[in-house]
C-alpha cells in the first residue's frame, strides 16, 4: 500500500498562523484534486465542534476539514484538552470524554495517549493522498520534549517532515526561527525541511538579504514569505477576541458578549459580526456593557464558576439593569443554563451542589455525566418559522413549563432568548429574522459557510502565489504557468 504524503506545520510560538496555513493548504490541494485531510495530534481549546461520527474535535480542525471538502471526523484531532480550571482539563480522546487531569498529571499521561493518536493518523494516511498535520505551540520547549505527542515527539513517532512557521507581524521573526532551530536537538532539527515567514505586510523586497542570511545560519531554506491577507475573517480557536471599547461609530448595532473566565465557543458570534451594521465586542467589566443593544452570554466550560463570577464581578447586576431599560439578551449553551431559574448538579459533573440562575428565562437545568453531542438540522418557530442548523455540546438537560420553542427558549416579554445550538447565528434566515424582530434591522442573512468558503479560497490563492512552486508540487499542486 502506498503511504500518504505527510507534512507537519510547526510554529515558533502559539498564534503563528499554523491553523490558517494548514486550512489554506488543504483548500489549495483540494482544488487541484488531491485527496487531503487535516490532522492535529493534540489540541487545547474550549472551542469545539461536533463531528459527523458523533464526537467532538477542536474548531480549527473543523475549519481545516471544511477547507479540504470533508466532513469533520474525530480522527482529525484525537486528543482534545478542554480547560475547566486553572490547572484542570477535561480529556477528550478520539471524540469522547475519558476523564479529567491536572496539569502535573498530564505530563505522565501523554505517552499512553500516543497509541490512539497514531491509530487515528494511520487511518487518515490509509484513506487520503496527503495528510497535513498541525503542531501545537512551539517545539522549542525542552522541558516538554520528553513524552511529547504534539510536536516533535509526534513527528518522530510518525516519521513526518516539518515546515517551521514564524510570524513576522509579531516582530523578531528571524530570531524566533533561528532560535527555535538552535533549541532543537540534532535529530529534531534534521526533520525541519523548510521555513515560512508568515503575515508579512509590504513588499518582500523590503526584507533584503535577511531570508538568505537566515538560510545560511540555520541551514534550512526559506520557501515563502506569506503576506498578511487583508481583512481575512476565519473562525479561530484562540483568537484574541475584541474587548469592549468605545461605542462604534456610524450607529452600528452594539452586540456585547460577556467574556467570563471559562468562556467557550466565542466564534458563535462570527456570523453576527460579519453583518453590515453590526459591531461585536467582548466585555469583562460591568461598565463595558454600557451602550449595548444586545448582550450575549456565550458557552461556558464550567457553568457554576462562571455564574458565580457574573455575580461577584457585578456583571449580573449590569445585565439586570440592561433588561430593565429594554435591552435584549441571548444565552447560548452554558449561557442558556445561566439565564434560567436554577442549575442542579446531583452527580458532581462540576463538583456537585446547586445554584440559582439569573432568573431571566423560565427554564431549569440538571447537569448529567453523559455529554450531549449532536449536529442539529431543524426549524425554529420564533422569531419566524425558518430553518436552523448548528450543533450541541453540553452536560445537562434543560426543561421548561412555558416559553420553550423548538431550539429556543424565550422569556414572557420576548426580550430574552436562549438556545443550546452553537453556531445558531450561522443560519442566515434565523439571524435576519431576529435582527428584524428585535431591532428592525434588515440584516443581509447571508450564508455564513459560503462566506467562510470564499475566505478559504482567498487564503489558498495567497499561498499558491507565496510558496515556492517546487515545494507545492511535491504535495500535488501542479506548477504555475510561466508568465
Curated annotation (Swiss-Prot):
Keywords: Cobalamin biosynthesis, Glutamine amidotransferase. One of its GO terms (biological process) is cobalamin biosynthetic process. The active site is at residues 333, 422. Residues 252-430 form the GATase cobBQ-type domain. One of its GO terms (molecular function) is catalytic activity. It comes from the Bacteria. Pathway: Cofactor biosynthesis; adenosylcobalamin biosynthesis. It holds the Pfam family GATase_3. InterPro entries: Class_I_gatase-like (IPR029062), CobQ/CobB/MinD/ParA_Nub-bd_dom (IPR002586), CobQ_GATase1 (IPR033949), CobQ_N (IPR047045), CobQ_synth (IPR004459), GATase_3 (IPR011698), P-loop_NTPase (IPR027417). Transmembrane segments: none annotated. Gene3D superfamilies: 3.40.50.880, P-loop containing nucleotide triphosphate hydrolases. HAMAP family: CobQ. Catalyzes amidations at positions B, D, E, and G on adenosylcobyrinic A,C-diamide. NH(2) groups are provided by glutamine, and one molecule of ATP is hydrogenolyzed for each amidation. Belongs to the CobB/CobQ family. CobQ subfamily. This is Cobyric acid synthase. It comes from Halorhodospira halophila (strain DSM 244 / SL1). The lineage of its organism: Bacteria, Pseudomonadati, Pseudomonadota, Gammaproteobacteria, Chromatiales. The gene is cobQ.
Amino acid at each position: 500500500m502506498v503511504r500518504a504524503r505527510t507534512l507537519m506545520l510547526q510554529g515558533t510560538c502559539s498564534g503563528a498562523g499554523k491553523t490558517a496555513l494548514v486550512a489554506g493548504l488543504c483548500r489549495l490541494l483540494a482544488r487541484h484534486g488531491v485527496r487531503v485531510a487535516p490532522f492535529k495530534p493534540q489540541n487545547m481549546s474550549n472551542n469545539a465542534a461536533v463531528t459527523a461520527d458523533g464526537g467532538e474535535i477542536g474548531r480549527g480542525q473543523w475549519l481545516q476539514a471544511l477547507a479540504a471538502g470533508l466532513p469533520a471526523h474525530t480522527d482529525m484531532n484525537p486528543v482534545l484538552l478542554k480547560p475547566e480550571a486553572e490547572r484542570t482539563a477535561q480529556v477528550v480522546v478520539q471524540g469522547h470524554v475519558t476523564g479529567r487531569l491536572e496539569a502535573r498529571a498530564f505530563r505522565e499521561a501523554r505517552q499512553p495517549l500516543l497509541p490512539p493518536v497514531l491509530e487515528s493518523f494511520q487511518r487518515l494516511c490509509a484513506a487520503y493522498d496527503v495528510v497535513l498535520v498541525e503542531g501545537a505551540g512551539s517545539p522549542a520547549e525542552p522541558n516538554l520534549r520528553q513524552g511529547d505527542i504534539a510536536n516533535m515527539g509526534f513527528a518522530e513517532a510518525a516519521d513526518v517532515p516539518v515546515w517551521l512557521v514564524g510570524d513576522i507581524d509579531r516582530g523578531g521573526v528571524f530570531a524566533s526561527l533561528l532560535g527555535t532551530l538552535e533549541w532543537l536537538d540534532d535529530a529534531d532539527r534534521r526533520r525541519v525541511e523548510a521555513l515560512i515567514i508568515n503575515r508579512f505586510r509590504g513588499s518582500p523586497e523590503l526584507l533584503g538579504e535577511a531570508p538568505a542570511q537566515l538560510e545560511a545560519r540555520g541551514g534550512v531554506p526559506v520557501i515563502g514569505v506569506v503576506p498578511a491577507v487583508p481583512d481575512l475573517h476565519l473562525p479561530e480557536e484562540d483568537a484574541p477576541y475584541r474587548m469592549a471599547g468605545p461605542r462604534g461609530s456610524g450607529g452600528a448595532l452594539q452586540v456585547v458578549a460577556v467574556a467570563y473566565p471559562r468562556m467557550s465557543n466565542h466564534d458563535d458570534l462570527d456570523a453576527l459580526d460579519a453583518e453590515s451594521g453590526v459591531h461585536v465586542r467582548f466585555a469583562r467589566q460591568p461598565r463595558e456593557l454600557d451602550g449595548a443593544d444586545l448582550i450575549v452570554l456565550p458557552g461556558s466550560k464550567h457553568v457554576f464558576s462562571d455564574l458565580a463570577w457574573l455575580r461577584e464581578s457585578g456583571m449580573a447586576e449590569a445585565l439586570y439593569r440592561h433588561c430593565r431599560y429594554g435591552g435584549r439578551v441571548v444565552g447560548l449553551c452554558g449561557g442558556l443554563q445561566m439565564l434560567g431559574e436554577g442549575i442542579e448538579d446531583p452527580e458532581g459533573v462540576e463538583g456537585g451542589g446547586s445554584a440559582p440562575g439569573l432568573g431571566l428565562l423560565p427554564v431549569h437545568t440538571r447537569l448529567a455525566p453523559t455529554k450531549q453531542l449532536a449536529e442539529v438540522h431543524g426549524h425554529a418557530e420564533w422569531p419566524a418559522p425558518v430553518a436552523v442548523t448548528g450543533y450541541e455540546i453540553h452536560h445537562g438537560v434543560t426543561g421548561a413549563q412555558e416559553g420553550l420553542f423548538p431550539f429556543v427558549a424565550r422569556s414572557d416579554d420576548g426580550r430574552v432568548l436562549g438556545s443550546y445550538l452553537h453556531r445558531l447565528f450561522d443560519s442566515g434566515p434565523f439571524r435576519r429574522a431576529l435582527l428584524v424582530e428585535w431591532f428592525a434591522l434588515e440584516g443581509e442573512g447571508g450564508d455564513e459557510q459560503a462566506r467562510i468558503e470564499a475566505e478559504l479560497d482567498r487564503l489558498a490563492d495567497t499561498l499558491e502565489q507565496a510558496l515556492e512552486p517546487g515545494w507545492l508540487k511535491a504535495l500535488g499542486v501542479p506548477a504555475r504557468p510561466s508568465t
